[in-house]
């Protein structure tokens, strides 16, 4: 009886794996495309939540400043809950972005209510954009990330987009 039960379980598991492989191969070549392109690009608020991440903040701000999107259609919020030297690095980085013409602000909270979710909620109260683009502190987005993704929102059925991401290295 135990042997038959295990055999049935393994057969079910194997069948499921084969079905997943089949579906992957069936749809692997299909690349999704937006239904239409926006005639005028919408305003996007880029939210960057950070907490004591002094080693990666400058890299993050530099990569965000290189995103290929009209500068007048971007609002950058650096949502900083840091308790170390990251606060000064954030302040200086935002000042550099403002000097480049970006609508950028450093929102520093001393009470971490809700942690990252709380920082995002707090920033959303001041967001001007029609869409939110959230990047973790260790992300380095490609310059074309908004151009490749924003047009999917022309479909009313799309409410969120998750893109593929990877890691640069193990330390920072």
Listing of model-derived features with the role each one plays in the protein:
Residues 30-172:
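Internal catalytic domains of large membrane-associated glycosyltransferases
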Residues 1-40:
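N-terminal membrane-anchoring/stem segments of glycan-assembly enzymes
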